[in-house]
Amino acid sequence: MNKQLAAFLRQFESTGSSEADRYLGCHAAEDGFVFRVWAPNAQRISVTGDFNFWNEEDLPMMPVGGGIWEAVSKFAKRGGAYKYCVTGADGTKVYKADPYGNRAMPLPETSSVIDPPEKFRWTDAVYRRNKLRQTSLQRPVNIYEVHAGSWKRHDDGSYLSYTELAEQLI
C-alpha cells in the first residue's frame, strides 16, 4: 500500500473525509487518468466508457486496500464518458456513475464525464491579509444562492461548468 493511500484511508476511516474527492474519482495521472472508487463489498469492478467502446472487460479495477478499487487508463481522454461496472457480493452486475465525478452527461444520460480539476494558482494574498485585519462585523455580508444544475444550461441542454457559471454570476 502506498503512502498516499495509507494516509487517505486513515482519514477516510476515522472521519469519512470531507476531502475524499481529492483521492477518489477520476484524476489526471502521468500516464493517463486514474479512476478510484470505494466499494468494499464488490466482487469485481471495471471502468467502461467511450474510450474502450464500453467494453466492461477492457479496464478491470484492482482492490488496493480499505475497500478502494483503482485502475489507470492511458486511452481515456478529457471530456470522455465513463461508468463503473460493479459486480456486487451477490453476483449482480450494475453500471454506476462515479460518486466523486466532477461532471455528468446531460439527462437522460447517466454517465460521468472525465473532467478532473486542474491546479489553480491563487492570487489573493493581499486580500486575505487585509481580511484578517477586520472582524466579521466590519465587513459587508454577501449572500447569493443558486442551484448550479437548474439555473442555466447550454442550448444543447448540457450543464455549465463552474467557471462558466462564475463568469455569468460575478
Named regions from a protein language model:
Residues 38-40, 54-56, 71:
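Beta-strand-enriched, solvent-exposed domains that form extended recognition/catalytic surfaces
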Residues 56-64:
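Solvent-exposed serine/threonine-rich low-complexity stretches and specific carbohydrate-binding patches
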Residues 38-45, 77:
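Short proline/glycine-enriched turn/loop motifs at strand-loop junctions of beta-rich domains
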Residues 39, 51, 147:
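A broadly conserved detector of short glycine/acidic/proline-rich loop/turn motifs that flank catalytic sites
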Residues 45-47, 82:
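Short beta-strand elements bearing conserved aromatic residues within extracellular beta-rich modules
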Residues 1-34, 63-145, 150-157, 164, ...:
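The feature marks proteins involved in alpha-glucan
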